[in-house]
Amino acid sequence: MFPMVTEFMNYGQQTVRAARYIGQGFIITLSHANRLPVTIQYPYEKLITSERFRGRIHFEFDKCIACEVCVRVCPIDLPVVDWKLETDIRKKRLLNYSIDFGICIFCGNCVEYCPTNCLSMTEEYELSTYDRHELNYNQIALGRLPMSIIDDYTIRTILNLPEIKT
């Protein structure tokens, strides 16, 4: 056969194959069009966090015995515990406790191993600031309880995500 005719036949086959691939992609796109959206409108809708969510650490100053277990179990030696030994009663007195959440990896080891349960994980995960030095929380900032998402009337909470079918 003539080379021009065979090239034209190959061109036709390639065109049909390309149209088939485009059609298959279009069918997949149309099958996803009737599904519910997966995203939520973040500032106005928030998911309720799970029971064991590891958010910001809450600290209770009165319960702390300055044993420094939290510092020893932390993989990055993050909590700063300042204490003074009271010689008359032979006990440590806690002076200062701080955690830098810019460095914290939220592993929860400090909460898990604390013998007096003065540390706990909260639901708070919005810790963004414009200055990284504001992420260094002292015992006063760590002692504040976060506002619960459930109690905030300006935010619509979503109890659970719709199941995603694959």
Swiss-Prot record:
Cofactor: binding details: Binds 2 [4Fe-4S] clusters per subunit.
The protein's name in its UniProt record: NAD(P)H-quinone oxidoreductase subunit I, chloroplastic
EC number(s) recorded for this UniProt protein: 7.1.1.-
Reactions this protein catalyses: a plastoquinone + NADH + (n+1) H(+)(in) = a plastoquinol + NAD(+) + n H(+)(out); a plastoquinone + NADPH + (n+1) H(+)(in) = a plastoquinol + NADP(+) + n H(+)(out)
Alphabetized NCBIfam families for the sequence: ndhI, NuoI, PRK05888.1-3
Residue ranges occupied by any 4Fe-4S ferredoxin-type domain in the UniProt entry: 55-84, 95-124
Record bears the keyword Translocase: yes
Amino-acid positions noted as binding [4Fe-4S] cluster 1 in the UniProt annotation, renumbered to this chain: 64, 67, 70, 114
GO molecular function: 4 iron, 4 sulfur cluster binding; iron ion binding; NADH dehydrogenase (ubiquinone) activity; quinone binding
HAMAP family reported in the protein's UniProt record: NDH1_NuoI
Entry-linked Gene3D superfamilies: 3.30.70.3270
Taxonomic source organism: Stevia rebaudiana (Stevia)
Assembly and interaction partners: NDH is composed of at least 16 different subunits, 5 of which are encoded in the nucleus.
Cofactor(s) this protein requires: [4Fe-4S] cluster
Annotated Gene Ontology cellular component terms: chloroplast thylakoid membrane
GO terms classed as biological process: photosynthesis, light reaction
Primary subcellular site in the record, as a coarse category: plastid
PROSITE patterns: 4FE4S_FER_1, 4FE4S_FER_2
Sites where the protein binds [4Fe-4S] cluster 2: 74, 104, 107, 110
S-S bridge residues: none
Family named by the database record: Belongs to the complex I 23 kDa subunit family.
Subcellular location per the Swiss-Prot or TrEMBL entry: Plastid, Chloroplast thylakoid membrane
